[in-house]
A protein has these predicted regions:
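Conserved glycine-rich Rossmann-like NAD(P)H-binding loop of the short-chain dehydrogenase/reductase
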Residues: 28-42
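Hydrophobic/aromatic anchor residues within beta-strands of the central parallel beta-sheet
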Residues: 57, 97, 160-163
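Conserved Rossmann-fold NAD(P)-dependent oxidoreductase catalytic core, especially the SDR/UDP-sugar
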Residues: 80, 84-140, 144, 148
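Conserved Rossmann-fold cofactor-binding substructure of NAD(P)-dependent oxidoreductases
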Residues: 56-77
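Strand-loop microenvironment adjacent to phosphate/nucleotide-handling motifs in alpha/beta enzyme folds
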Residues: 4, 114, 148-327
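Rossmann-fold scaffold of SDR-type NAD(P)-dependent oxidoreductases
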Residues: 10, 72-81, 122
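Conserved residues in the N-terminal Rossmann fold of short-chain dehydrogenase/reductase
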Residues: 37, 58-59, 99, 248
Length: 327
């Protein structure tokens, strides 16, 4: 699908962007890959690793609509991965988070439509479902913008979809590097907020594969949600440092005990497939039948009141499995 195509990824110097580009170069022969991001040092460092002739590096901010439009000239596919995602920072700097995560999303949409991009996938988070913090609220707003964008295109070909998933193993700012840093610096205990806390858990490679697949599946307007395992944070602490005691410090503002991917309030718009769910748009877009996707896979409506959260997930990782995922 990506052979001889031009792909742009916003926030391309992040954990997801690096893995996405690595796998893209391994599997396909793209015409051009454009990394669009703000930090020239990260781009310089990335160029040392990814220096294939097809690579291009654009310094720019998703807040800058004109720069985005220049970057998307003759682009076929866009992955929107740029975001401010640190929950405490978003609470303290709310307008900065809104400018990047909401206004930036609309700028990506406008540029993609103006440039005739074929397909756009925006990355989302489980924190966008029933959000209780500003970061989650901005990502929910972004999801709504990308879904509604399919009604803005008229007779043009541009299509938009969203991929929502949970915590990515070892990503920047996540709990794994936090725990490992404590251990490396001689910590005598590991802090967790609540022994009951659970999270969805995803390997970065699986997240990239899910995005690849959904470029094929998408018709426009879907929120794609993978069926992935959950983990107990207390088990993760045991996997990383089994010899250290655990200190319960209390839940932080903006945290949930369990994260939600498919809210029960949207069960009537949720379709289950073999390895994923799809939340359909709440209004008709092009009269698509979302129970059959673009590659012919068939799904079925979920039961009344269905919700998919990290606490009721039938698949939990064991301490041993977590240790293998976090060597």
């Amino acid at each position: 699908m990506f052979n001889n195509k031009t792909i742009l990824i916003t926030g391309g110097t992040g954990s997801f962007g690096k893995k996405f580009i690595s796998m893209l170069l391994d599997r396909y022969r793209p015409k051009k890959i454009i990394v669009y991001s703000r930090d020239e040092l990260k781009q310089f460092e990335m160029q040392q690793k990814f220096n294939a002739p097809c690579m291009r590096y654009f310094i720019g901010d998703v807040r800058d609509g004109a720069r985005l439009e220049k970057a998307m000239y003759k682009v076929d596919y866009v992955v929107h991965a740029a975001a401010l995602k640190q929950v405490p920072a978003a609470e303290y700097n709310p307008m900065e988070c809104i400018m990047t995560n909401v206004h930036g999303a609309q700028n990506v949409i406008n540029a993609a439509i103006a440039c005739g991009v074929k397909k756009v996938i925006a990355l989302s988070t489980d924190k966008a479902a029933n959000p209780i913090n500003l970061y989650g609220a901005t990502k929910l707003c972004s999801d709504k913008l990308f879904t509604a964008a399919n009604a803005m295109v008229g007779d043009r070909e541009t299509r938009f979809a969203v991929v929502r998933y949970g915590n990515v193993v070892g990503s920047r700012g996540s709990v794994v590097p936090f725990f490992k840093n404590l251990v490396a610096n001689g910590a005598t205990e590991l802090p967790i907020t609540d022994e009951r806390m659970t999270r969805f858990w995803l390997k970065l490679e699986d997240g990239v594969n899910f995005v690849f697949k959904n470029f094929e599946r998408m018709q426009g307007g879907e929120i794609f949600i993978p069926k992935i395992p959950s983990m107990r944070v207390v088990d993760l602490a045991k996997a990383i440092a089994p010899e250290l005691p655990i200190k319960v410090i209390g839940i932080r503002p903006g945290e949930k005990l369990h994260e939600v991917m498919c809210p029960s309030d949207l069960y009537y718009d949720t379709i289950e497939f073999d390895d994923h769910f799809v939340i359909m748009p709440s209004f008709d877009i092009k009269k698509y039948d979302y129970t059959t996707n673009a590659i012919g896979e068939k799904g079925k409506p979920v039961p009344d009141g269905f919700d998919y959260n990290s606490g009721n997930n039938p698949h939990f990782l064991t301490v041993e499995e977590l240790r293998e995922m976090n060597p």
